[in-house]
Each structure stands twice: as C-alpha cells, then as structure tokens.
Amino acid sequence: MVGGGTKRRRRRLQLSKLYTLTCAQACFKQDHSQIGGPGFSRVVYCNEPDSPEADSRNYSDNYVRTTKYTLATFLPKSLFEQFRRVANFYFLVTGVLAFTPLAPYTASSAIVPLLFVIGATMVKEGVEDWRRQKQDNEVNNRKVKVHRGDGSFDAKEWKTLSIGDIVKVEKNEFFPADLVLLSSSYEDAICYVETMNLDGETNLKVKQGLEVTSSLRDEFNFKGFEAFVKCEDPNANLYSFVGTMELKGAKYPLSPQQLLLRDSKLRNTDFIFGAVIFTGHDTKVIQNSTDPPSKRSMIEKKMDKIIYLMFFMVITMAFIGSVIFGVTTRDDLKDGVMKRWYLRPDSSSIFFDPKRAPVAAIYHFLTAVMLYSYFIPISLYVSIEIVKVLQSIFINQDIHMYYEEADKPARARTSNLNEELGQVDTILSDKTGTLTCNSMEFIKCSVAGTAYGRGVTEVEMAMGRRKGGPLVFQSDENDIDMEYSKEAITEESTVKGFNFRDERIMNGNWVTETHADVIQKFFRLLAVCHTVIPEVDEDTEKISYEAESPDEAAFVIAARELGFEFFNRTQTTISVRELDLVSGKRVERLYKVLNVLEFNSTRKRMSVIVQEEDGKLLLLCKGADNVMFERLSKNGREFEEETRDHVNEYADAGLRTLILAYRELDEKEYKVFNERISEAKSSVSADRESLIEEVTEKIEKDLILLGATAVEDKLQNGVPDCIDKLAQAGIKIWVLTGDKMETAINIGFACSLLRQDMKQIIINLETPEIQSLEKTGEKDVIAKASKENVLSQIINGKTQLKYSGGNAFALIIDGKSLAYALDDDIKHIFLELAVSCASVICCRSSPKQKALVTRLVKSGNGKTTLAIGDGANDVGMLQEADIGVGISGVEGMQAVMSSDIAIAQFRYLERLLLVHGHWCYRRISTMICYFFYKNITFGFTLFLYETYTTFSSTPAYNDWFLSLYNVFFSSLPVIALGVFDQDVSARYCLKFPLLYQEGVQNVLFSWRRILGWMFNGFYSAVIIFFLCKSSLQSQAFNHDGKTPGREILGGTMYTCIVWVVNLQMALAISYFTLIQHIVIWSSIVVWYFFITVYGELPSRISTGAYKVFVEALAPSLSYWLITLFVVVATLMPYFIYSALQMSFFPMYHGMIQWLRYEGQCNDPEYCDIVRQRSIRPTTVGFTARLEAKKRSVRISEPAS
C-alpha cells in the first residue's frame, strides 16, 4: 500500500504550503493581521478531550445548526419577522380591533385574509427551514472513527466530537471538523484535499503534517500519544492558520499546510489521522456562512414610501370623517328629537350619542381606520415575492444564457434584485477572467535583452484595424517584415497554453544564441520556480500539469516545449529534464527545494530557494516589473533598458508580463535567513505575516536580471460587441484591473471600451518631481506631494472636460494615484471627473481599491451600480455593489458564491440587463402601480359611500366582499402581468438598446407615474360611485317596485369595480398570453360564481348578500345596463389618454411598438429615426462614442 502511495505521490506531489487555498490570500491578508485582538488563546490537549483542563475551556460542541427556527421558536419568531413589515402590522392592529364593537365588519372577514397572507409566508418559511433541518441531521449524524484512548478507533457521530479528539478519516470522506493533520497513509504525512464545498475549486490541494508526527501511521501508535496545541481563536479566514504544537518538550510551528477544513474531502489518500482543533460553529466554514449583505432594490425602497403615503391618506380621511361625524352627531339632537333617528342612539350610549360627540368622533376615527384599510394592498408583498421567484426561474432557464461548453446556465442566486437589473447606470468590471478567458498562452519573451516570439495578439490586431492598415511585425534580430494574413493570425496553437513561434530558440536552437547561458537560466527558472503538480497518464505516459493559476501552467508548458521539462516533484525536490549546454545531451537534474516564498497581491512576486546537485544555492524569483526592477543589483542590470522597452511593447500588445531574476546565495547568508524565517513562522502572534515579510525582504534583493515573460489572456467571445451594446444602452462601464496602464489601455481598445479619437485623461505619479522625491525624500513628504499632484491632475482633467466642446473623454488612473484619489477630501472631486467621462479604467488596482471605488460610485451618484468579476479578489467589489454578478470561470467559485447572479460568460450580461433587466423592471413597476390603483379604486368608493351616509361607519359592501377583493377577484391578473408581460420582444430589446434608459431614468416608476396611477384610481372610484348612485337612486329597481338598498347599490358597484380593474389590466398589458386571458376573465367569472353561491347560503351566514344576485341583480336589466355603461365610462379616460400619448408624445417603447405594428422594424431609415429620437448629446455613454467614431471618420477622409 505504501509503495503504491509513493508512486502516486511522485506523480502529484506539490509544495503543500502553497496549495492551501492560496487563490484568495490576497483579499484576506489584511484581516489576518487583525485576528481577534490578542486572538491566540485557543489551547487544545490532543488525545485528552476529557481532561479537566480541556473541560474548563467550554468550547462549542460539534453540533451544527443552520436553521432559523426551532420547534419552540418557530411561531413567535416567524410571526415577529412577518409583523416587522409595516403593512402587516397595520392589518394585525385592524384585525384585533375587528373583535371590538367598533368594527364595521365581522372579525372573521378581517382576520381570514391576514391569516391567508401570513400563513402562506409562514408555510414557505417552515418548509425551507424543515429542509435545512433535514440537511443538518444528515450532516450531524455522519460517522467518523475516533480514538478511544486504548489504541483502537470506534465510529462515532460527528455531533459527538470534542476538541482534542484524534480522528481517522478515510478516502473520499469529508473532514468532520477543523483538524490538524498528524499523519497519513503516505510516509511523509501528505494528503490530497478537495475543497469544492469551500471555494468551488475542483483542483486538488496537498497538505502535509509535521515531520515529528508523520510516523504515527497505525492506530495503536496513538495509545499514550499526547500533544499540546496553542493556536489562533476561531475566525472566518480560510487562508490562514497560526499555531504551535508542543510535543516531547519541543515546539513546532503550525500553518495552513497542516490545517484540514471541515467539509473538504480527502482524495487520493487512503486515510489520515488528525486532531480536532475547531468544532461546530467555531469551524472556519461555518464562520464563513454568515448571510451576505442585505440588498434591497430602489423600487422596493420607494414602495415603502408609497405605503407610508397610503397610511397618511388613510389617517387623513379617517380624521376628516371623524371630525365631520363628531360635528354632525353633536348637532343631531334638536328640541329633544334626533334628526338621524335610524341610528338608534338609545341602543348605543357612545357611538351616536350627541351628548358625548367628541368621544363618538374618536371611536369613529378608529372605525374609519379599519374601514379604509382596504387602501393598503394586503397581498402586495406576497404577490411580489411570487412574481420575483418566477422571474428568477425564467432567468435560470434562458437557453440564450447557457454556456454549453462548460454546461453552466445563468443562475439568479437571489430574486430580490430582479428589477434592479433594469436600472443599472454603471458597470464596474474586473478584467482577467471576466473580460478575458483567463486561459493564458505563452506567446513572447525577452531574454538577455533580446525579444523572442512572433505571435500576434488580439490587441495588436485591434491596433492594426484602428490604424486601417495591414498588421506588420518587425523582428528585432532579422529586420524582416512579416505581414500576417487573417488565417495566420487566427491559427490555433497545437499545445494549450503555448502559442510561441521563434525558430531561434525552439528545437534546441537556443544553444547557438549569443547569451545561451542566460537563456538556459531563464527557462530553468520557469521549470523550477512554481507550484505545479505533474500528472502522468498511465496509458500514454504523457505528463500534464495541474496548476492553481493558468499563468503557472503556461510557464511550465513553455519551459517544457523549449527543452526544460518538469516531470516529477516530491515534498523537497523538483526534477527537470533539460538540455545540457556543454554536452548537448538531455539530462535529468534534481533540485532540492529549501524554501518557498509565496506570491500574494502585496508582495507581487514569488521566490524559491533551491540547491543544485553541485551544492550551489540559488534564489529564483519572478514578479511584477514595478517590484522586480527595484530589487536588481548594480551588476544585475545589464539588460534592464532593453527589457523595460520590451515589457512596454508587450504591455502595448495587451500581454501580461513578469520579470525573471535570480541570485546566488552563500551558505552563511542562507543559514542566517533560514533561522530567521523559521523563527518568524514559529511566531504565534498577529504580526507573524509582517515578521515573515521582513525576513523575505532582506533575501529578495541584489537580483540579476534574466528577462521577462509575456502571456496572452484572450478576450472572451462577444466581449467587444457586448460592451458596445451596453454603451449604446447608455450604461457607463468602468474596468478595474491589476494590469499595467499600457496593457489596460490597449485591452480597452480591443474590447471597444475605448474608441479612436476619444481624448484620454491619464492620472499617474510617473512625473519627474515625484520620481526624484521617491529617490531622496521621506515618506511623509512623498505622500503629501503625491496627493497634491493627483488633485492637480484631477482639476486639470475637469478643466479639459469643461472646455472640450462635447468631445468624448476616457479617464485612466493607476493604483498609486487611485489610493490618493480615494481620500475623503478628494474622492468626490475625482467622482465628478469620472462620471463625466465615457469610459474609466483603473489600473494596478488592489482588491480593496476595487471595493472602495465601487462604494464611491454607488454612494456618490445615487444610481444603481453593478459589479462583475470572477475571482476571490473581486468578492469585496461584488458585495459592495447594488448588484454583484459572478462569472463562473476557471478561478474557482468564490466570486459566484458571493454574487447575486451568476453567469458563465461576460457576453451574457447584454441579455441579462437589456432583456431580463428591462422586462423585470417594467413588470414590477407596472405591477406595483396597478396594485395601488386597484386598491384606491376599491377603497375610495368606501370613503365616498361613507360621505354619502354622513360618515355613519357603514361599509358599502358585504363583509366577505371586502375580504376577498384582494385575494380572489383582482390578484391573479397582476401576478400574471408581473411574470409574462413584455412591452417589446427580446429581439427588439437588443435591437434598440436605448430602451434600457427607461429603467435607468426610472421613467416607469417615477412619482409622476405613480401619482398618475393613483389619480386613475381616484377618478375611477368617483365615476363608479356617482354613476351607480345616480342610476339607482329614487327609482324602482325591479318589477315589484322596490327601491335599491345598500345591498343592491353595493353589489352593483362591486360588480363594476371587478370589471373595471380587470379590464384596466387588459388595457395595460402589452403582450397577451393564454394564461393572462384565463386569469383576467376567470377573475370576473369567479366573482359571479361567488356572489351566486354565497347568496344561497343561509342568511345568518350571507347576511345582506342573501339571494341578492339571484333574486335582485341578475333579473334586473338595469343592473346589466348600468354595469356596461359604468365600465365603459370609467375606462374611457385612460383609453383616450393612451391614444393621445401614443400619437403625440410616445414613450420609447411605444415607438418600437409602432415600428413593429407598421412592419417597419427592418427598415434602416425608420429604425434610425426611432434610435435618434431618444438620444440626447452627452459626453458619456453611446453618444460620446458615436461622436468619437464620426470624428475619426471625418479626420481620415482627407487622407483617403
């Protein structure tokens, strides 16, 4: 077994320290230095979980609960959650008051609708929590082998584990808690771990236990085993772990290399032994399971204001009515006789007692508040939740946003922000993996001052297209001009990750080059300085590489293709097959890995210290140019000038560059370094990282330059077209990238973010004054001068814009300048400049800066922001934005797990916003407006009837008519509108992207439109009430000669309202489906069915509605004629207004509908008329780009 394990290990082994979830160390690095104040109080007695010392610590058990409720707390807690909503609380108060004599209706009719709405939501909450409970039980009852204390292991449930337990986890099992790895089935205590449940990554990580515990590979070895661990307190940082283990009187440092996280899985390893360090809710995965930031859409926030406005209206009407009622009641008694004798004051000592009119007015106020509660739509919240869930399903099922290659559909991870997708003003995008494929290809390099590689990048092709001529590449060495045809340019490399072509160094020809020794060191560094795992296919014996980043894979593949094949790795060695410069033969060389100084976004470099077979010590380093050039020795700068020029050329071509350098170490220097780095790593304190950084700074210096690499990260398919279409929609696009400024600018041109003849405002600190200060000045002086310089450049930029004459501008700013631009006293001036530009590119941006820029844009202009990214370094930006969109690419799933919506490719953003965003915004906006319209139409008739009856608190309708209006007779059509309505089809949404501005400018949910719908409700109620009253008043209603009473008038008005609100819905719908026809007409049919069946019930149940339809309304011709006349008269004003609006001042979607109706959608002239009609000249967005393009054409015309 051990022999087989060793064989597998040789195929897959890697430096485990670098493979403990390092992909996101950058964004958590700062938090690590702040862990818990003192933060290192956890003490673990390994193999002694029941010792008195361990018991006194009172650490949490391993039972995990993710439910919101327990059986005891479900009812009170869920009710509390429901009644936190103001509307629900209002209906609760009116429901309670319905049990008092003050109620104008029966208590049951008031409570049943509330119970229906609250009950539906509680059932949903209960089902969801029950599912969570089932999942919790499944996890907590899993079994794992635990040491009994006598050298044997028994299976126990996860929930019974205690701190200090020794557990045995076998292949393909999940780790039950956070463990310190002690040993494994491999001799050197390594194991393979899959972290899919933590970060979504499928590539395996390798962990390794301490050498001192690696021999504990049998169960009986743990009899008598004792160890003492002191480590950091529980925290949410997945990527750090600091601690020490005391064993046999010696202390050993612990790091993420030894930490096995709960819910990750053991793979390709037969078993491991580990000590439980964190349990239950102290484990890092549970610490990370807090809810994401709560986000609410702008429409939802505005809806709350409308609810408050409706409350104010209800209170106002109740107050007016109670005052009038009080005055009338006071004047009711004249000469001992009651004017309104039918109110029977003798039966009620308070309500209608003229002697106590103020008290009667107060009681009337409470009654009126209950009666007018129908102004507030009780089913609004539930209906919106249902609609949003169904909208999300449509987004998830959209075949046009399904990425077949990776089998990844779009996924709305929350339905709260659907309508917000239709109001995005600014998009803030990452570049690598978001705009690009994050699939790196080694294409060029500079070695010893000589440029190699003749590949042509997409950016170079775009530059050629901008200049309008053929693409010409000039070789440095041969001065040969080569014009590449389209076929040659697009020819794909036969080796993934390698698109390098240059016969001077391929096929071993590098040995004849002038600086062959430098070339050898260059590619040897690529073959050795990395964290890649080699894998051997047992059938073909071909080696493939598993790397944490595509850059690393590209470097190793390039080294292999050029004669330096990395083929094996152990914990302490790397094996490379390479061409010997002296003998000319391929030889196998073994490099002993002594130390690894890992890469992170702060260091921007990675180094390894290796020992060659002859004992020579080498430090091999690769990193970003801005940190590497300053670390070169005086004698190591021989090729610096040429390399800098080449790096700038590569950046112009849109390539990602790294500088390669090395130095030889003497044994004494290395010995001192190794002692200091070991001491720093052994430190158990919050400044451990800074101590390590301090030590590495002293060794990574005096380097000798070898050259630079250049890899291409190609744009994703459809990115330029998508950006162009989003710009046409008037959406501003910012790109936040860690690339060099030159690279970012040229990528901007390649992806249509920048246009030729767009003027550029560039803000950076590469000025002679600042550079001279950096060499001689102090930090405070440099910072002050830099800040003043940035402010000056921002002000100059604003001046340029002011006198630009309408020219389009692009703002480009680097990371150093951005740090000062985000200071509190400058950031608002910077924002004013940025939002006035057509495009903004922030270069060399850190993850923190991305989040700060997003926060600034969101809070600064008050409009909706959308952030899109694919990596862990984008998480802060995604959570800060109003909407976070994660790209499910190749950098793991952390961005997706922190996002609101996930898509597989950037190009799908076009359809997500312009189609689904526009539809959802329109649907939700119209739905909310209609909800308030139909409730005002219904509720205001109650007020008018109250006025007609001198505010006697008598409702116009039967109790159950009141209760079921919002539930059965008017709710389904509005839900159907929210799910299915389309003002224009998806095709025309994309063809006329400016339609999207209706959402950005909030045209469909402005106060003007909201108040317009409210006014529609008020005048509809007035028309219905007065026409019905006038038509029925003082005349015989049927053949018996009876005049209509409350039941007849109320039944007639109610019928008219049901017809009006449902036909109003039909007039508001733009796109009819069979479902909409069914729900509209069925709502009317259900009303007639209900009034018939309800009226047949005994009179003690149906009260005034007893046989009112069958015996009074239906037989009467006037009832049907009045219904027809009132419905037509009520809807006619809206119909006339819509016709006039469409004819004389159509909205943008109306113009598109007219084009479609007239069949002119394919006529370019008509389409241009429609497009231009909605465009206002501006210096941002599409019109600015269009003007830049036109000027470019005009400028080039004389030359042609």
Curated annotation (Swiss-Prot):
It holds the Pfam family PhoLip_ATPase_N. GO terms for biological process: phospholipid transport; protein localization involved in auxin polar transport. Residues 1-75, 125-306, 383-925, 980-1009, 1069-1074, 1138-1200 are cytoplasmic. Mg(2+) binds at residues 870, 874. Keywords: ATP-binding, Magnesium, Membrane, Metal-binding, Nucleotide-binding, Translocase, Transmembrane, Transmembrane helix. GO terms for cellular component: membrane. The keyword S-adenosyl-L-methionine does not apply. GO terms for molecular function: ATP binding; ATP hydrolysis activity; ATPase-coupled intramembrane lipid transporter activity; magnesium ion binding. CDD domains: P-type_ATPase_APLT_Dnf-like (cd02073). The keyword Repressor does not apply. The chain crosses the membrane at residues 76-97, 102-124, 307-328, 365-382, 926-945, 960-979, 1010-1032, 1046-1068, 1075-1095, 1113-1137. It comes from the Eukaryota. InterPro entries: ATPase_P-typ_cyto_dom_N (IPR023299), ATPase_P-typ_P_site (IPR018303), ATPase_P-typ_TM_dom_sf (IPR023298), ATPase_P-typ_transduc_dom_A_sf (IPR008250), HAD-like_sf (IPR036412), HAD_sf (IPR023214), P-type_ATPase_IV (IPR006539), P-type_ATPase_N (IPR032631). It is a multi-pass membrane protein. It catalyses: ATP + H2O + phospholipidSide 1 = ADP + phosphate + phospholipidSide 2. The active site is at 430 (4-aspartylphosphate intermediate). Its EC number is 7.6.2.1. Residues 98-101, 329-364, 946-959, 1033-1045, 1096-1112 are extracellular. It is found in: Membrane. Involved in transport of phospholipids. Belongs to the cation transport ATPase (P-type) (TC 3.A.3) family. Type IV subfamily. This is Putative phospholipid-transporting ATPase 9. It comes from Arabidopsis thaliana (Mouse-ear cress).
